[in-house]
Structure formats: C-alpha cells, structure tokens
C-alpha cells in the first residue's frame, strides 16, 4: 500500500465521515480532512466538525488548527497535506483524504502549481503606476528579458496578465511560463482510489435541511456570538463560510432568524450542487450512489474489494 491514496469525497451532509472512519479501521488508515471550513478553531457547529467520539480512535489531521482571524491558502494546505501523506505512508499506513472541498483535493491529486496564489501588492501598485505613466507596451517590454515565452504569448493590452507574469518572476525567480503544467493535469505521484458519495437529490436536500436545524439546536447562534466577541467580522475568510455570514447578518439585525435559517439551508443546497458539478469534472472519480446499496457496510466492502483487487 506504499503509494496508495484513498479519497472519500462528496457533497455536504452525504455521510462521508462515518464511512471514512469505518474504512480507516479496516484498511489501517489515517484521515486527512479536505474541508476548507473545518480547518478553523472555535468553528465547530457551523462547519459540522467531526467530534472526538465520531473519530473512533482514528487520527484525523488538518482539522481545528487555523486561527479564524488568519487567511489560509490552498498552497499552504497542499504543503501540509503532502507532508502528512508522506508521514502516514512512511509508517506503513493508508492516507485517506475525506471532505468536500474540491480545490483542496485537486491540489493533491492534480498537476497544479500555486505560485499564482502569492501576491506582492506593493510591486503590483508600482507596475500599475509604470503602465499608467508609460503605457501598456512599455510594461510589456519589461517581460522580454526575463520571460520571452510570456512576452510572446501575452498581449500587451492584457495588463493584468502582464503584471501577474512580472510579479511571479519577482516572487519566485522563475518565469511565469515555467509554471504551466507541462504534462497532463491528472498526473499524480499517487496510486489513487477516488470515490464520490451521492444520493437522490430530494433525500440529500432533506438531510441538508435537517443538519441546519440540528446546528441551531446545538448552539450555532452562541458559537457565532462568541466569534463576534473575539473580533471576527464578515470580511474575514473564515466568516464567509455558509452558516457564519448569515448568522452575522441576523446578529447585526439585517435579517430575521427565520430568514437566516432559510438562507443557510438554501446556501447549503446550492453548495452541494456546485460540489457535485466540480467532482464530475474529474474522469478518475468513481461515483457511488448510496441509494443502490443496502448498507454502509456494503459500500465499505465495495471500496475495499476495489483496492485489494486492483
């Protein structure tokens, strides 16, 4: 199992956690969360964070470790997750990615480069000033000596892209053109088993609505009040998550509680739809319709057989 990587993905509320813990127990695995909200501390209810009890003694990584006042990039996630995969494999265990953030998953299993995530605002402003004073062609000429390929492929009037190319060179010391995927986007060093859980849409939406009701019963309002008291505001990355921004609107008197709950349910259903659209783009993803299996045990057996017999 040295280079195997199991992925259990799917839309919100489909039931990924229970299945993944069961698989981890049976396959000697450890779990790496691929959820862009569960990374944050103090945000347990609205992110539906897995509890210690639900973990069933299986180690879970990249959960509950980022301060919600801080920004956290996909590039940072990729670096931490890649290190953790190596660590798990070095101990003879199976790393299992579990979650619904498609970009996090792709950062690990696709040939992507996140140099473009880095920014140098000061240098950008300087380049904008140069372009305003001397024109786009002058700015474009600055590319010629450092990145001829980008100079030839980017039109001088595409100021935003020209600035991006110059900025990338300043940040990395490498030409912007060198960051293009040289091979297939689906090239990966791992032997992947990629499963996406799904179910009848009406059933999934019912589960989503019920989950939102349970969040309020568990104390979502109190959780967001505490975050607000800590100084968190709606312009922070963490507070833009579904469930948090709407409760902030309610606490600020912008909407009623009824509207708040309905907005979270609608937002979560729309998000589930977008998640499924994202997962369908990857030809390696094997969709598992939960309705066609009589039990979770059967789904677990199917995945284990696939891995053993491959």
UniProtKB/Swiss-Prot annotation:
Q: Name one GO biological process term.
A: tRNA modification
Q: Where is this region: Interaction with substrate tRNA?
A: 35-38
Q: Which residues bind ATP?
A: 10-17
User: Under which main EC class is this enzyme filed?
Assistant: transferase
Q: Where is this site: Interaction with substrate tRNA?
A: 101, 124
Q: Which residues bind substrate?
A: 12-17
Record field: catalytic activity: adenosine(37) in tRNA + dimethylallyl diphosphate = N(6)-dimethylallyladenosine(37) in tRNA + diphosphate
Report the protein's function. Answer: Catalyzes the transfer of a dimethylallyl group onto the adenine at position 37 in tRNAs that read codons beginning with uridine, leading to the formation of N6-(dimethylallyl)adenosine (i(6)A).
Q: Which family does it belong to?
A: Belongs to the IPP transferase family.
- Name-wise, this protein is tRNA dimethylallyltransferase
Gene source species: Clostridium perfringens (strain SM101 / Type A)
């Amino acid at each position: 199992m040295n280079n195997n990587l199991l992925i259990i993905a799917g839309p919100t509320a489909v039931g990924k956690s229970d299945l993944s813990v069961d698989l981890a127990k049976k396959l000697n695995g450890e779990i790496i969360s691929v959820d862009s909200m569960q990374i944050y501390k103090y945000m347990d209810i609205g992110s539906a964070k897995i509890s210690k009890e639900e973990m069933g003694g299986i180690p879970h990584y990249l959960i509950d470790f980022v301060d919600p006042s801080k920004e956290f990039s996909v590039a940072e996630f990729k670096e931490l997750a890649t290190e953790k995969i190596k660590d798990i494999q070095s101990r003879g265990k199976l790393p299992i990615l579990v979650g619904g953030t498609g970009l996090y998953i792709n950062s690990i299993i696709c040939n992507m480069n996140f140099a473009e995530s880095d920014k140098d605002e000061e240098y950008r402003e300087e380049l904008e000033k140069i372009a305003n004073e001397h024109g786009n062609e002058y700015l474009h000429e600055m590319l010629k000596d450092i990145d001829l390929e980008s100079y030839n492929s980017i039109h001088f009037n595409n100021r935003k892209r020209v600035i991006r190319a110059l900025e990338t060179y300043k940040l990395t010391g490498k030409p912007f053109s060198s960051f293009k995927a040289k091979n297939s986007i689906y090239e990966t060093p791992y032997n992947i088993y990629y499963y996406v859980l799904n179910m009848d849409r009406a059933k999934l939406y019912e589960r989503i609505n019920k989950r939102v009701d349970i969040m309020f019963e568990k104390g979502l309002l109190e959780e967001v009040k505490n975050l607000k008291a800590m100084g968190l505001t709606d312009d922070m990355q963490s507070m833009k998550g579904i469930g948090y921004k709407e409760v902030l609107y309610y606490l600020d008197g912008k909407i009623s509680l009824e509207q708040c709950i309905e907005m979270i349910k609608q937002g979560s259903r729309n998000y589930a739809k977008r998640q499924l659209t994202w997962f369908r783009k990857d030809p390696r993803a094997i969709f598992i319709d939960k309705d066609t299996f009589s039990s979770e045990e059967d789904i677990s057996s199917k995945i284990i057989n696939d891995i053993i017999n491959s």
